[in-house]
A protein has these predicted regions:
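N-terminal, charge-rich interaction modules
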Residues: 3-23, 145-180
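An N-terminus-focused feature that recognizes amino-terminal "leader" regions
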Residues: 2-65
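A short linear-motif detector with a strong N-terminal bias
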Residues: 1-3, 42, 52-56, 83-87, ...
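Long compositionally biased, domain-poor regions of proteins
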Residues: 9, 45-61, 78, 82-84, ...
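Hydrophobic, ordered structural segments
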Residues: 27, 63-165
């Protein structure tokens, strides 16, 4: 499966990445019809596809087993281009062969900073002045604000462009928050 769009058609947000959680049930009846050689080839094809996706710039893919009867296997895909995410989703769905993986549910979201981040002014007033007793515009106060700003720059970047570890277990829950 190849891209049928140009770089000009990419859907890349101003900040952050697209995130897709994909959950599949394995049709064990369909899987059992395949010979051992066909099953091995299908597993090899899926492994190669995962490696190919993981080697794509600005893209991460986590794969995991689901511990409930709602699904058997899942993927968490983070990437900058929505068209690329859509292509990867289609490729993953058919990677083991037609009708082997049945989507049970999926979620599309984006990484974001959130509306609850402390501003330098709030940090200065609430922490530096009230808690630590520092006076505004002193060297110690300004150094602390500079450190806070460096920390928040890294924090913001990590939220928008996370580096997800390939952990054997993670918790997922869908967010029901309405966005404006």
């Amino acid at each position: 499966m190849t891209n049928n769009y140009s770089e000009e058609d990419q859907i890349i947000p101003n900040e952050g990445w697209h995130v897709i959680h994909l959950f599949y049930q394995i049709d064990h009846a369909q899987w059992s019809i395949l010979s051992e050689e066909e099953q091995l080839k299908a597993k090899t094809d899926l492994t190669k596809l995962i490696q190919d996706i993981r080697s794509t710039p600005n893209t991460q893919l986590l794969s995991f087993s689901i511990v409930t009867p709602k699904a058997d296997i899942g993927f968490m895909l983070l990437t900058d281009d929505l068209h690329q995410a859509n292509l990867f989703e289609k490729q993953l769905t058919i990677a083991l062969g037609p009708d082997i993986l049945t989507p049970s549910f999926s979620y599309l979201s984006m990484t974001e900073t959130g509306d609850y981040m402390t501003t330098p002014e709030e940090y200065g007033q609430n922490v530096l002045q009230k808690e630590r007793g520092l006076t505004k515009d002193t060297v110690e106060y300004n150094d602390a604000i500079d450190e806070f700003n460096k920390h928040m720059t890294k924090y913001t970047n990590d939220k928008l462009y996370p580096s997800m570890p390939d952990w054997p277990v993670f918790c997922f829950y869908s967010m029901a928050k309405r966005r404006g």
